[in-house]
């Protein structure tokens, strides 16, 4: 991925670019975006007309690469007395860091909306989302689960559990009666 992106930006044939990296497992998350260090080393190599070796240690990596999860979720659920879910309203605040590293800041909200309560038959849903930019490393990196499914599922099940408890219902029965059929 990096080689193809570099070839495109540098207007060089892909076969003229060599990126050497040890086997670090997978190709997801922090390994996907093009970070400033990559760009600087590539430009230096082009300007100097010789190979440039860029080395990053673990602390530098943690400071400069992205993070995925700094999210606050709040919501409410409309219920009938018998436990049928009538609707949900969700608000999220997401810290995107200094910039959103995957160039698609709507991905978080779309993924959250598609994931939250997907297993349940809910006739009405409303989501508001606010992304903020802070002085942290870049945000928006997907790892351990894409499109914010992890946060959405945790949030969904906590709301379902709280709703069942508020109604004095068995949680398993509450879930069964509201599953998509």
Descriptions of predicted regions:
Residues 70-159:
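Glycine-rich loop/linker segments at domain edges
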Residues 1-24, 28-48, 104-117, 144-178:
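Alpha-helical support elements that line or immediately flank enzyme active sites
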Residues 18-21, 54-56, 86-90, 176:
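General beta-strand structural signal in soluble alpha/beta enzymes
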Residues 24, 57-59, 127:
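Residues that form or immediately flank small-molecule/cofactor binding pockets and catalytic motifs
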């Amino acid at each position: 991925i990096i080689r193809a992106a570099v070839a495109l930006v540098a207007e060089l044939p892909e076969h003229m670019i060599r990126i050497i990296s040890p086997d670090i497992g997978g190709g997801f998350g922090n390994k996907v975006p093009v970070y400033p260090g990559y760009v600087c080393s590539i430009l230096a190599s082009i300007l100097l007309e010789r190979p440039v070796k860029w080395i990053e240690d673990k602390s530098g990596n943690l400071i400069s690469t992205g993070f995925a999860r700094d999210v606050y979720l709040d919501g409410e659920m409309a219920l009938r007395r018998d436990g049928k879910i009538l609707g949900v309203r969700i608000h999220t605040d997401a810290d995107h860091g200094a910039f959103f590293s995957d160039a698609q800041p709507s991905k978080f909200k779309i993924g959250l909306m598609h994931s939250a309560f997907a297993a349940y038959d809910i006739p009405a849903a409303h989501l508001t989302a606010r992304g903020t930019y802070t002085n942290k490393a870049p945000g928006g990196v997907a790892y351990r689960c894409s499109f914010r499914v992890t946060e959405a599922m945790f949030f969904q099940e906590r709301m379902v559990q709280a709703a069942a408890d508020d109604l004095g219902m068995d949680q398993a029965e509450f879930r069964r009666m509201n599953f998509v059929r």
